[in-house]
Structure formats: structure tokens, C-alpha cells
Amino acid sequence: MGIDPGIATMGWGVIEIKNERLKVKSYKNRPNPTNHPNLTLIDFGCIKTPPEQVMPQRLKHVYRELLKLIKLHQPQLIAIERLFFGMNSKTAMTVGQARGIILLATANFPKVEIAELAPLAIKSRLTGYGRTDKNGMKEAVKRILKLKELPKSDDAADALAVAICATMKNAN
């Protein structure tokens, strides 16, 4: 399962390898998805919070929805995009809170492995270029997962990119 952290919108995506949800022994030794014929999409979407809610309520909503998703999909690995320190401090603080909620939710499932991936590494692994734009990332996700159309949500597409990248060797 890949997650693109956010409070207003948190993207998530679940992929499967060889009919097993990321059942590979070690995160460091995962196969390269561009050479992997059995990488398939299971599900993806976004957790959205109402902007009029106060932050504690938004965090609680994200937490509860994420718990439901983890229980439903039972991933063996949850991959999270690392903070990009070039963003402004208010955005970084909000994304940091979202990441904390993801880690807290994951802590309820001790057998679930956690991987944290840098945005630049994700882009370069999937497209060969670390400064790829959103459409380039969506195209890569579409190609790798053999989708008929691009994911509409940037957040869900980013989460799928994180999940795909987590299956690759030395992704971080």
C-alpha cells in the first residue's frame, strides 16, 4: 500500500505482486516493477476531510479511515512519501501531522512493514527523471500498472507511484 500524506486529501493505493500483496521477504530486495509482469492494481482512492473541521477532527477522520483501509486490504508493506523540505513551513507542518497519523495507524498492525521514500527517488525510479511533473508520473503509473486511463486524482496517482516504487530495489 502506498500513501501520499495530506490532511485535506490523502491519496492511497494498493497493488499486488504475484497474487500476493507485497509478500516479498525484504523491502531492500524487491523486484523492479518495470521488469515485473505480475504487478497489478487492487484499489486506490483518497481520504478527504472537510476544510471547515478543526484540525484534531480532521486528523481523527484520516486516522479512522486509514485504519479501515488497512484492515480491508491487509498490506504487508505501507510505503509513505517522505517530507520534501523545500515546501513552505505551514505545508510541511500539515504534511508532518498527516505522516504522524499514518505511522500511528500502522502501529496498530505490528506485522506491517513501513517504508519511507523520497519524492525525488520515486520520480526518478518511475520515469528516469527526478523532476517529472504530475502528468509524467500519472503516465508512468498507467504504463507500469497497465491501466486503460490515467488516475484522475493526483493524490491517488502519487500514492500508487509510492507503492510501485516500494516494490523496487534500493528505492530510497
Language-model regions, residue ranges each:
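Phosphate- and other anionic-substrate recognition elements at nucleic-acid/protein interfaces
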Residues: 1-20, 28-172
